[in-house]
Amino acid sequence: MIKYLGSKRLLIPSILETIKTVPNIRTVSDVFSGTSRVGHALKKSKFRVLSNDYCEFACTLARCYVEADDTLTADAEKIIRELNGLQGSAGYFTETFCEKSHFFQAKNGERIDAIREEIEKKSLDEPLRSVLLTSLMEAADRVDSTCGIQMAYVKSWSKRSHNPLQLRVPHLLARSPHGSSKAYCMDANAFVMSNEFQGVDAVYLDPPYNQHSYLGNYHIWETLVKWDKPEHYGKACKRTECKVKKSKFNSKREYFETFKALISNIDTKLIIVSFNNEGYLKPDQIVDVLRTKGDVCIRQTPYKRYVGAQLGQYNPRGERVSEVSHLDNIEYTFYVSSDPSVVSALNKD
């Protein structure tokens, strides 16, 4: 899966274990799906999964790893063999992300251009189209020249950027015995109030924590998926949409009320919330909101900050303008249930 700030790889075993302790959980919703690492793990554990994300690239990943079933693997393998045989042809991607900026070597940018144009020409149905786009995203991610996010590229080419671009077939899973999984691209608060959210037994929430927009952090993937060849700005060649498409979860002023509204519209057997010590809300504020839905258990997981945050900030001349404040973060996981026995069992662990 793609490199992603805030990946929940370390939390997945605990999340799965907890959900399995609650009786009659069949459908689980991942409301801020990101890379779909959590959604993929849930589907692998036989749950029916409803994924959602505000960004189109994240929804594409969810269509691949959550919505698509393994019955599509043979078709994907055939087309990916064909795409891997294409010669490069410079276009928008090469010009924007290899020449005007240096996120990728030109030889790989040219192949990305050629492969993406070929996918577009095929006019494939979903979710097969998203399986191929995910394969391309992940191939590009393996040869980029960043510290993990697309706010900037490194001054000297990364070692991996010299490798040739090669598509791989994503690992698709069997359909859940509880029904087909589905991916949506909606505002989170609108999603939990929609008909699509009906029948959800448990929900996992991993909202943005602060002002940093995932659209801005991963704008290249959004452009690659939409293939709208947008106008852009700055050294990172961000799509201009980044200036106007904002989530209320990126606003300190609006965050608390938006989070409170989100929780108020969820009525499931279990709610799981991830949050970070660098976020706008303090743990006690989150607990106060969650207690309206039942008893709350909190767990903490320490982890290293992403590599870019460990370097400090530098001006255009390469001079350090700020020191690193801390190297470690804490991930809080809140478990909420109206069934006291569920939270009681968690508190004994």
Spans of features found by a protein language model:
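SAM-dependent nucleic-acid methyltransferase catalytic core
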Residues: 33, 95-217, 229-245
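S-adenosyl-L-methionine
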Residues: 1-32, 37-45, 60-61, 68
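Conserved acidic residues
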Residues: 26, 200-201, 269
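Conserved Class I SAM-dependent methyltransferase catalytic core
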Residues: 247-293, 297
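C-terminal catalytic and target-recognition region of SAM-dependent MTase-like enzymes
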Residues: 282-348
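Glycine-rich S-adenosyl-L-methionine
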Residues: 223-262
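Conserved phosphoryl-transfer catalytic core
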Residues: 57, 62-114
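Conserved SAM-binding motif I beta-strand of class I
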Residues: 49-53
